[in-house]
């Protein structure tokens, strides 16, 4: 009879768990209170650690805020998607993230903060320029700003301002309403009169 020496794979290191706990607490705090009213002490209390640990991992409140704003939109590469399907795929992707993934608390934090905080506004521009443009391919790169305006407008009205008419819409109704608008930006020649 042999002893079974298989062990479960190790979990995340304690330092990784601490860093994650701090970042999660910071995102929730910044989302609820904004940059100015959020304190390192409050973030530390929410994370269940000493405030000095927050400073050890992130250095300052501004650096913690910047880390909280580090977002991967997880966009699929749409450059190989047929042109007539890109708009719908993009709308569905963003809608799915906002509807189903807690990670988009960070995206909503960024959107909320970008209105009043220069650092957040800069970060929002960087994220959308660096991630949306490559996902759409070179043909659409000049229109990334307008596509972003459509998608961020949806997030603003549905998830931050919670405008009743937009909140009541089902995801399929939103896809049906937004896809033609995004398509008209991505493929202006296809939506032109007489095209």
Model regions and ranges:
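Amphipathic alpha-helical segments used for helix-helix packing
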Residues: 69, 98-129
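Short alpha-helical scaffolding segments that buttress acidic/His motifs in well-ordered protein cores
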Residues: 94, 107-114, 147-151, 155
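An amphipathic alpha-helix adjacent to DNA-recognition modules
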Residues: 19, 23-24, 36, 57-80
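Hydrophobic/aromatic-rich alpha-helical bundle segments in the mid-to-C-terminal region
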Residues: 121-125, 136-195
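Hydrophobic alpha-helical connector segments
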Residues: 75-108
